Amino acid sequence: MAEQTEKAFLKQPKVFLSSKKSGKGKRPGKGGNRFWKNIGLGFKTPREAIDGAYVDKKCPFTGTVSIRGRILAGTCHSAKMQRTIIVRRDYLHFVKKYQRYEKRHSNIPAHVSPCFRVKEGDHIIIGQCRPLSKTVRFNVLKVIPAGSSSSFGKKAFTGM
């Protein structure tokens, strides 16, 4: 996924690759010729973002996007787009007339960096950022595989 498939040479804007010093011949990511940052908020930078060779300007770890605003959790509903997934958030809505709850959901498109491997059913934590496209305003910060046990171990809608 990190191969150069575009017609133009992809490079990180903050990294100078034409150095005449001892770093000659080293690939970005192997010799320290890679820009990455700690986004804070208690999220660790993935190993693939530090050691990888991909170039993604919309990645929160290696690009120019900052995370601010809401932090949300949900389940990956669709991973069919390129570098974009649909996160489904289930919730309960109270109907006053009947004194009951009804199930509802919302779909949120989110940009996924190449440092993550996301499949349908995985639990996702996303963070709000500036608008990345017409509909995308969130970025994937953490992926919890579907089979692992974590804080998502409880079933949804158990209060009924």
UniProtKB/Swiss-Prot annotation:
GO BP of this protein: translation
Pfam families registered for this protein in UniProt: Ribosomal_S17, Ribosomal_S17_N
GO cellular component annotations of the record: cytosol; cytosolic ribosome; cytosolic small ribosomal subunit; plant-type cell wall; plasmodesma
GO molecular function: mRNA binding; rRNA binding; structural constituent of ribosome
Gene3D superfamilies for this protein: 2.40.50.1000
This protein's record includes keyword Ligase: no
Encoding gene (name): RPS11A
Listed PANTHER family: 40S RIBOSOMAL PROTEIN S11 FAMILY MEMBER, SMALL RIBOSOMAL SUBUNIT PROTEIN US17X-RELATED
Localization of this protein: Cytoplasm
Superkingdom per UniProt: Eukaryota
Chief location category: cytoplasm
Keywords, sorted A to Z: Cytoplasm, Ribonucleoprotein, Ribosomal protein, RNA-binding, rRNA-binding
Name of the protein in its database record: Small ribosomal subunit protein uS17z
Family stated for the protein in its record: Belongs to the universal ribosomal protein uS17 family.
